[in-house]
């Protein structure tokens, strides 16, 4: 099957997983005696996936936006902020031509990146993100922690790429998850200027003028916002244009997880040199898995395996 057709089919399947009849609406559990015969059973908070679909609201189809209330606990939010404090640097943007990270007045926040699986809390949140989005952990970039002080913002932008260099690292960012780590007294809303139903959202004086330019979501500690940057046919979605409105009162902390079409982890490691991509590689190699399971462990020149370093298939 042509890879583009397969990708488009996969995306169509992914985007139809949260089957919801109208916006906004809640994920519901349908009984098995539905008239049309379609049976959709959503698990509750006791789910082994570690997330509760009953807390998810579909906000929009154009772009595809979902809000998860209480995705993070207060302890998780506070832990992320603690990890970031003292390590923040001025936020950068990707140059549209070269793909290099450059400073810009478009983005005035400060931030830092956590390491993947940095500790148990980070690992648990990464697993929960994969369960909610139905996208593999390895497709995600490291989480970025952002801090916005009074007046700081991120003007409307796209999360998909315009340069070839970034596309080589797992392809486009298919989805973005914004996690709010703090409450904001006023401002700091996430705004979607291109949302077709923006006129239906009534806003009082508690919203900033920036937020009134589109459909907007107020930051609330623990909530998470998932939106897709690509259409189901794998083309870029201009409706996903979004920004972070200036903070007017207080401060804003958030965490961002960008998720790619393909494995970001493998593409990044391939560029970085000879590396293992699983913590158990050395143990597996000693057990003879390099010979027993060469496809996974070693791979080929075109499709590298996950344990090339331990299998001595490359030199660091």
Swiss-Prot record:
Record gene name: P4H7
Amino acids binding 2-oxoglutarate: 252
Name used for this protein in its record: Probable prolyl 4-hydroxylase 7
Transmembrane segments: 5-24
Domain ShKT: 274-314
Lineage summary: Eukaryota, Viridiplantae, Streptophyta, Embryophyta, Tracheophyta
Keywords, alphabetical: Dioxygenase, Disulfide bond, Endoplasmic reticulum, Glycoprotein, Iron, Membrane, Metal-binding, Oxidoreductase, Signal-anchor, Transmembrane, Transmembrane helix
Disulfide bonds: 274-314, 281-307, 290-311
EC primary class: oxidoreductase
One Pfam entry name: 2OG-FeII_Oxy_3
Sugar-modified residues: 96, 233, 278
Family to which the UniProt record says this protein belongs: Belongs to the P4HA family.
Superkingdom classification of source: Eukaryota
Limits of the Fe2OG dioxygenase domain: 139-261
